[in-house]
From Swiss-Prot:
SUPFAM superfamilies: EF-Tu/eEF-1alpha/eIF2-gamma C-terminal domain, P-loop containing nucleoside triphosphate hydrolases, Translation proteins. This is Elongation factor Tu 1. It comes from Bartonella bacilliformis (strain ATCC 35685 / KC583 / Herrer 020/F12,63). PROSITE patterns: G_TR_1, G_TR_2. Residues 131-134 are annotated as: G4. Residues 19-26 are annotated as: G1. The lineage of its organism: Bacteria, Pseudomonadati, Pseudomonadota, Alphaproteobacteria, Hyphomicrobiales. Its main location: cytoplasm. Belongs to the TRAFAC class translation factor GTPase superfamily. Classic translation factor GTPase family. EF-Tu/EF-1A subfamily. HAMAP family: EF_Tu_B.
Amino acid sequence: MAKSKFERTKLHVNIGTIGHVDHGKTSLTAAITKYFGEFKAYDQIDAAPEERARGITISTAHVEYETDQRHYAHVDCPGHADYVKNMITGAAQMDGAILVVSAADGPMPQTREHILLARQVGVPAIVVFLNKVDQVDDAELLELVELEVRELLSKYDFPGDDIPIVKGSALAALEDSDKSIGEDAVRLLMSEVDRYIPTPERPVDQSFLMPIEDVFSISGRGTVVTGRVERGVVKVGEEIEIVGIRPTSKTTVTGVEMFRKLLDQGQAGDNIGALLRGIDREGIERGQVLAKPGSVTPHTKFKAEAYILTKDEGGRHTPFFTNYRPQFYFRTTDVTGIVTLPEGTEMVMPGDNVAMDVSLIVPIAMEEKLRFAIREGGRTVGAGIVSKIIE
């Protein structure tokens, strides 16, 4: 049994299972909890609760477990559409993924799509579990499937030759039938996950960035901007940049307040007010960010991967075409952008996920993996992620 208390002493890593429908993602998730956490049966995981992220409803199951080295938060989704939505909205951030492939079927369409999505949304590392090996009698056939999986991973720019592939049977692990492909395989899988999936950098160790939510003018003191520090640390007296919407400018933080108390610094997760030197109330606005100088730049053109809501999800009722002009909601503000669809894609239907080029009418502080909502008059009609910056 895992300890019930959440021990902060271990490194925390977020992972998830991905792969084709019925290849055994949920069974594997259940099997991992059996040996490394508080056992959750298949039915408990499969009945995933609905949650909302960026105005989109997604069913996601969360389980947690721990190895000797790490504490894991693990996400498993019941349906393919939930995976697409989850990965694009970042509802459950993934530091790495376990790709489940049935040895009996080999890679299938959703295997490919999940690998592509993992690449587009920047999942840093993948470990493979080749499931249902007891259904394949021929060792050569098993080798062939492994080769296919490696080639597919390489095709989408993952290091296919180096990725650990563990062969086993989630069912054998759950039923205690064959230890070598059951329990032993699940334990080996987790030791490979420990070894191969890198420890994420903690937000507080990254470069300072704070999206501006509000701007106030305090007589005799100057201009205060408020927001939640997304990452890094800002200390009183430090020089920072104001990026996005207008030309980038520099200023000094002369004070940091939280809950009406003065602090000497604000850090990732804190809701702060920052007093800025020599900036007037009109010179700064919501939608800009405060950032460590040189760490983030403003851009207007980018490639994105997006999911478009269905009518039932509250989205559009009709398709859209190239030159579609919705608002793109980045962090704290809406910016109008013009969509260009890829060659060969004539239109996008509600419920589709699509790669597209976007050109914003004003620049936004942007980097790859930044997420956004697509809105029409304040109503969310889609969600996306920046896959590549063009200019």
